[in-house]
Regions:
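Short, flexible helix-loop junctions that flank or precede catalytic/ligand sites
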Residues: 2-391
């Protein structure tokens, strides 16, 4: 990873230095930049491919200048250091925009977290790495006139990217599409986007309530966080609207269970849910330097003619043995058979068995498939899913 640009000698050089810092963070493939004040200096850390790592350390005296410049760029209160603040900046000099900034007071000073934005158009559904059957199922769900499409996974799993790809795939000319988000992460032409503002009482439920009076065809709710939002989203899906939303849950079946715990009756879920999709992001092994995983790889090559299970090595091109990330997906299309099984009280393992019988692999199945092909490592599957792939 490249070194930081030299510290500026004069205060008037600070803006150019900060722009260069942001540009280098982006070039390093970082999704987040952390500025962490400590007793002996300020540590800059980057999150790359979902994993945090130390970048550089700068003198403690420079922390206030760096924080001040970023706060000015994000139009935050420069004098307020006691309370957390949230903002957004765009920096033409660094070549990146739509950077989310969050500050946090700590015992050593203000910590900053910068979520580096992704400029350009919304992602294409065909570039998400979905299998042909999964892509077809998602496309069919998006063509429905009403119902609920639920994307689930933990923070950092790529749910928002998938939502934006879904919205971009819709016909914006013949449908009125509106969103409620926290925050708006990407501007989509032809779509009415609203950001929640909790400080003035503008939360998901209140915006959704207002949007339903705006004659929408498609609604995107950034996240279901409470009973009221869950109830309103399901009611909207029942009354002639296609609703796309996300939920924090570990799997497709867990997402349905979570909605049940939020007060949505089973029969209502069976009637309104069109598709649930769980997803994760795994680090893709660098094809230049990946190393076969002992004798197991030879057996896999002989049996499948694939590259076989591999582990990360690291080279000058990739730095840490990884080259980007790859998505794994678990789909639960709510057809009549699965809806009946859900209403009959079939437990999670039973529902997952039904999914496999219908040809819908689980997250662990997809991870194992990529591992056997040498695209991801066993260690990364353990990091993301909590268990290693079965041999």
């Amino acid at each position: 990873m490249s070194a930081l640009p030299a510290l500026p000698r004069h205060d008037h050089d600070v803006p150019a230095w900060v722009s260069a810092l942001l540009r280098q963070a982006l070039e390093a493939g970082a999704s987040d930049l952390h500025v962490e004040p400590q007793a002996d200096g300020t540590l800059l850390r980057l999150r790359r491919h979902g994993v945090m790592g130390d970048w550089q350390r700068i003198p403690a005296a420079w922390a206030p200048r760096l924080a001040a410049r970023i706060k000015v760029m994000a139009q935050l209160d420069l004098a307020e250091r006691r309370l957390p603040q949230d903002g957004r900046l765009q920096d033409a000099a660094s070549g990146i925009g739509n950077i989310r900034v969050a500050t946090l007071p700590t015992v050593h000073g203000e910590k900053l977290c910068l979520r580096l934005g992704e400029p350009g158009d919304a992602p294409d559904l065909d570039r998400l790495g979905l299998s042909a059957s999964a892509r077809q199922a998602l496309g069919q769900a998006l063509q429905q006139p009403q119902g609920l499409i639920l994307i689930t996974g933990p923070t950092g799993a790529g749910k928002t990217t998938t939502l934006y790809a879904c919205l971009a795939a819709l016909d914006r000319h013949s449908r009125h599409i509106a969103t409620v988000e926290d925050p708006v992460e990407r501007l989509l032409p032809g779509i009415n986007q609203t950001a929640v503002q909790p400080r003035i009482g503008l939360d998901f439920a209140s915006v959704l309530r207002a949007l339903l009076r705006q004659d929408p065809d498609v609604l995107m709710v950034g996240e279901i966080r409470d009973r009221e939002t869950a109830s309103m989203a399901v009611q909207a899906a029942e009354t002639g609207h296609l609703v796309l939303t996300t939920l924090h849950a570990g799997s497709t079946v867990e997402a349905l269970t979570r909605l049940r715990h939020l007060g949505i009756p089973d029969y209502q879920l069976a009637d309104t849910v069109k598709l649930v999709m769980a997803q994760r992001l795994l680090r893709r092994l660098c094809a230049r330097c990946r190393q076969p995983q002992a004798a197991m790889a030879l057996q896999a090559v002989a049996e499948t003619s694939a590259h076989g299970p591999c582990m990360a090595q690291g080279c000058s091109a990739c730095r840490d043995g990884h080259d980007g990330r790859v998505g794994i997906y678990e789909l639960l299309p709510m057809d009549a058979a699965l809806a009946a099984a859900w209403c009959a009280g079939l437990d999670s393992s039973g529902l997952q068995a039904r999914m496999r019988e219908q040809g819908w692999p689980l997250l662990a199945d997809e991870a194992t498939r990529l591992w056997r092909r040498g695209e991801v490592s066993s260690d990364d599957i353990l990091r993301v899913l909590g268990s290693r792939p079965a041999c």
